[in-house]
A protein has these predicted regions:
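Extracytoplasmic/lumenal domain signature
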Residues: 1-6, 39-61, 78, 93-124, ...
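Short catalytic/ligand-binding loop motif for oxyanion handling, primarily in non-cytosolic enzymes
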Residues: 150-151, 410-412
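Asp/Glu-centered strand-loop micro-motifs enriched in Gly/Pro and often flanked by an aromatic residue
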Residues: 1-31, 55-58, 376-384
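Repeat-blade elements of multi-bladed beta-propeller folds
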Residues: 16-36, 63-92, 126-151, 158, ...
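Glycine-rich beta-alpha junction loops
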Residues: 288, 311, 407-409
Length: 567
């Protein structure tokens, strides 16, 4: 389809800003966002530019790189007016005329609402960024934000709804409950005050029929040390259902108690139908970094398959009080390995085996939910393990949920801080705070596969098939690769996905997991594709952003790649 010029502010000094946007298509026009928050509209069949808007977004806070996952669309009930809405890196909510790309002047101030107002006023230098597209319900635009992970005090992670025409605030949901609200008792003493985190940085889902919105809530800050927030820390690490019109709580389900692993809820909740006990049940599936898939009754928030509270290891860090148990779904089984032994060390090359074995023997690890300790610790899976923001796709006819996951562990230790530091301990390692358990080639230290594509039957709770996703060209075995980006599934029974670090776009047989096709890209596609029918030609297109960069670095590009069958 073409390339988007990568301007000076698209990237940081290493030129690694990932192109994570999933386009939307409205009446033959494809609209997407760039890492620097530009919104661009193209003819969906030719790729010819129609308009673009640059909000001149600046960087606030220590985020590693620019990233943005897309825009959303609202249309008036009469069908006449349409708006493109999205958030920016510097904490603004923008409304554009969908036809012209010009700001809607009656929205907020000249088309912009200052999202920092009321939640980040006391922290002018702290991050408050919107990296995921907001949700739309009727005439409301609903958004969360990315907030600091360190220190523990900072901008609020509340979810807010604004009038889509005027930009006026309609409701606020306190993801960290205030006195008198449900869940406030889960915060001991005054730990809730000025607490940052417990935010919704990922993508929300709306059940239009019921008028509910589902929030995947992140970890409370600081992610790896909870001595100043003893308790279960609601609504962190929860799936929360709200009345979309009012923000009123319907139900919640917590998937990690007192998180000290950065196991926030990274993925958009998937609204599914489950055939359970002889009847169809409206359900919601929540993917996690732990590799678990929680399948809940959409009306009640109760699990449809058994979930067991199991004892987990304790922390040896002074002041830390780990929660004694964590929830383990019995079905579906975890999609990634959750422990590591010497037998799991990679043997692909002598050099990799030697490096990884030496590192392994220097680390502490006691199975799933091992806390980062005072000694260097191996945590399996790590912060980039399991599923991530790209979520899953669902085929209702088969009941299959298609999920790509990472087999990535993490390494770190809790290091004492200076007396005047915000917290007594902070996670660190020789490679920085977010070190992965991989060798000098960024090949994970465990035996392959390193990344997989999975089909989960939500009716039975069983994994139907699992295949390696991606490969390393210089290695002969099917390793799979680390991956970020999601799937789509078509009526024709194809699952499309990029995501891998080998710069390829693939199609799989939905029923068997057999790879049917692979196409080369200019760079890896760390995004989720879209498919649509051409308004004029009637041809089916599949489009994906292929920009590389991000956590896995590699070569970068600005390509938006469009695929279609020949005429």
């Amino acid at each position: 389809m073409g390339e988007v010029e990568r301007r000076g502010n698209e990237t940081d000094q290493h030129n690694i800003a990932p192109f994570e946007s999933t386009p939307i298509v409205i009446n033959g026009v494809l609209v997407f966002s760039t890492p620097s928050n530009r919104a661009i509209a193209l003819d969906a069949e030719t790729g010819q530019e129609i308009w673009q808007f640059d909000p001149q977004a600046g960087r606030i806070g220590p985020r590693q790189f620019f990233q943005h996952r897309g825009v959303t669309y609202w249309q008036s009930k009469t069908g006449g007016e349409g708006r493109i809405l999205y958030g920016t890196f510097d904490g603004r909510l923008i409304a554009l005329d969908a036809k012209t790309g010009k700001p809607c002047r009656e929205f907020g101030k000249d088309g912009t609402v200052d999202l920092r107002a009321g939640v980040a006023d006391a922290y002018p230098g702290a991050e408050y960024s919107v990296t995921s597209p907001p949700a739309i319900y009727q005439d409301l635009v609903i958004t969360g934000a990315a907030v600091p992970e360190y220190p523990s005090k900072g901008p609020s992670g509340y979810v807010r709804a604004f009038d889509v025409r005027s930009g006026k605030l309609v409701w606020t949901f306190h993801t960290i409950p205030r006195p008198g609200e449900v869940g406030h008792e889960s915060w001991e003493e005054d730990a809730w005050k000025q607490r940052t985190g417990a935010n919704v940085w990922s993508i929300m889902s709306v059940d239009v029929e019921r008028g509910w919105i589902f929030l995947p809530v992140g970890s409370a800050s600081y992610d790896f040390y909870g001595a100043d927030r003893k308790g279960m820390d609601l609504f962190s690490n929860c799936l929360v259902a709200l009345e979309a019109a009012t923000g009123k709580l319907v139900w919640y389900y917590q998937m990690v108690h007192h998180d000290i692993w950065d196991y926030d809820m990274p993925a958009q909740p998937v609204l599914i139908t489950v055939r359970h006990d002889g009847r169809d049940i409206a359900a919601v599936a929540q993917l996690t970094k732990m590799g678990f898939v929680f399948i809940l009754d959409r009306l009640t928030g109760k699990p449809l398959f058994p979930v067991e509270e199991r004892p987990v290891p304790k922390s040896d860090v002074p002041g830390e009080t780990t929660w004694p148990t964590q929830p383990f779904p019995v079905k579906p089984p975890p999609l990634v390995r959750q422990s590591f032994s010497e037998n799991d060390i990679s043997t692909l090359t002598p050099e990799s085996n030697r490096y990884c074995a030496q590192l392994f023997h220097s680390l502490e690890s006691h199975g799933m939910y091992t806390p980062y300790g005072r000694k260097m610790t191996l945590v399996v899976p790590g912060t980039l393990g399991g599923a991530n923001w790209s979520g899953a796709s669902f085929d209702r006819a088969s009941g299959y949920l298609f999920v790509n996951v990472n087999e990535l562990a993490a390494v770190g230790a809790m290091e004492p801080q200076a007396a005047d530091a915000p917290l007594r301990y902070r996670r660190g390692s020789k490679e920085g705070e977010y070190a992965r358990y991989w060798d000098e080639h960024q090949w994970p230290c465990q035996k392959p596969p390193w990344g997989t594509l999975n089909a989960v039957d939500v009716n039975t709770g069983l994994v139907v098939w699992k295949v390696p996703l991606g490969g390393v060209d210089e290695l002969k075995v099917k390793t799979g690769t680390p991956n970020l980006g999601g799937t789509i599934v078509t009526d024709g029974g194809l699952v499309f996905i990029g995501a891998t670090i080998d710069s390829r776009f693939r199609a799989f047989d939905m029923r068997t997991g057999e790879q049917l096709w692979a196409g080369d890209l200019e760079a890896s596609a760390h995004a989720t594709p879209i498919t649509y029918m051409g308004k004029q030609s009637g041809r089916q297109f599949v489009v994906i952003a292929a920009g590389g960069g991000g956590y896995f670095k590699g070569r970068v590009s600005d390509a938006l790649a469009a695929f279609a069958l020949p005429d």
